Structure formats: structure tokens, C-alpha cells
UniProtKB/Swiss-Prot annotation:
Main location: cytoplasm
Protein name as annotated: Endoribonuclease YbeY
Subcellular location, record wording: Cytoplasm
Similarity-based family: Belongs to the endoribonuclease YbeY family.
PANTHER family, per the entry: ENDORIBONUCLEASE YBEY, CHLOROPLASTIC
GO cellular component, as recorded: cytoplasm
Keywords: Cytoplasm, Endonuclease, Hydrolase, Metal-binding, Nuclease, Ribosome biogenesis, rRNA processing, Zinc
Role of this protein: Single strand-specific metallo-endoribonuclease involved in late-stage 70S ribosome quality control and in maturation of the 3' terminus of the 16S rRNA.
UniProt lineage: Bacteria, Pseudomonadati, Pseudomonadota, Gammaproteobacteria, Enterobacterales
Enzyme Commission no: 3.1.-.-
């Protein structure tokens, strides 16, 4: 049986209105068991200042971002279920949901799904890989009862 272990860290001043730990767990469980038996993930919800600092340090981008993924790389002789860390910026997620006309909870779910796929090695730099990743994201989001994250909820179908 697959197991997903979540370490949730809330590092922003106001935790009011954030998804629950059960929400984050549910979203991880929709992704990870498809790929590996046991997974341990840390999700850290941060403010814009911390996101900005990490994005600048690790990606050279001078702005906060929605989600950063840091895969854990164990030495080959050590087997650990640690998959890595997701850093999600509350303000950016909330702002994007408004701008993209998406339900806030659906956008949070998408950030967890998207970041988890990065931890598993998926990327969207090359077009073919982007299409594959987006297809997997859409399928997982729909299995969770959310719409296609790449279509605005107000777009005609």
C-alpha cells in the first residue's frame, strides 16, 4: 500500500484561509502513489519575501513565484523515501487565482500537483515535456474534481 508522509510548515504571518493539512495530504495522495510506494514531502507555505529570496538564490529570478520544488537527492547507497520540498507562496497563489479567474482552492491544488511532478522529475522547459506534464496535471486535477488548470474557468469550452 502506498504511503505519503507530509510535513506541513506554515511560515507566513496569517494562516487564516489556507487549505487544511488534510487538503494538502489529499492532493499529494492524488499524485505520488502513482509513481512510488512511499513518499515523504515537506510543503512550506511562505510569504512573498521568503519566496522572493529563494527564487533569487536558486533560480536567479528577482521576484516571488508561486511554487518552488527542491528534489531530495540521496547518495546512491542510501535509500530514503524523502522526495523533496515544495515552497508555495501564499500571496502569489492568491493573486494568480484572481488574475486567472480560478477558484482559489483549485489553484492551491494545482500548485501542489505541479510542484509534486517537478519533484518526480517532470519539467516544462521543452515543449514535448511541457505537453506531457500538463496532460498529467490535467488528468490528476480532474480526478480530484477540479477543472483543467490551463483553461480559465470563464473561458468558453
Amino acid at each position: 500500500m502506498s504511503q505519503v508522509i507530509l510535513d506541513l510548515q506554515i511560515a507566513c504571518a496569517d494562516s487564516q484561509g489556507l487549505p487544511t493539512e488534510a487538503d494538502f495530504q489529499h492532493w499529494l495522495e492524488a499524485v505520488l502513489p502513482q509513481f512510488q510506494e512511499v513518499s515523504e514531502v515537506t510543503i512550506r507555505v511562505v510569504d512573498e519575501a521568503e519566496s522572493h529570496e529563494l527564487n533569487l538564490t536558486y533560480r536567479g529570478k528577482d521576484k516571488p513565484t508561486n511554487v518552488l520544488s527542491f528534489p531530495f537527492e540521496a547518495p546512491p547507497e542510501i535509500e530514503l523515501p524523502l522526495l523533496g520540498d515544495l515552497i508555495i507562496c501564499r500571496q502569489v497563489v492568491e493573486q494568480e487565482a484572481v488574475e486567472q479567474e480560478k477558484a482559489l482552492l483549485a489553484h492551491w491544488a494545482h500548485m501542489v500537483v505541479h510542484g509534486s511532478l517537478h519533484l518526480l522529475g517532470y519539467d516544462h522547459i521543452v515543449d514535448d515535456e511541457a505537453e506531457e506534464m500538463e496532460s498529467i496535471e490535467t488528468e490528476i486535477m480532474q480526478s480530484l474534481g477540479y477543472p483543467d488548470p490551463y483553461i480559465s474557468e470563464k473561458d468558453p469550452e
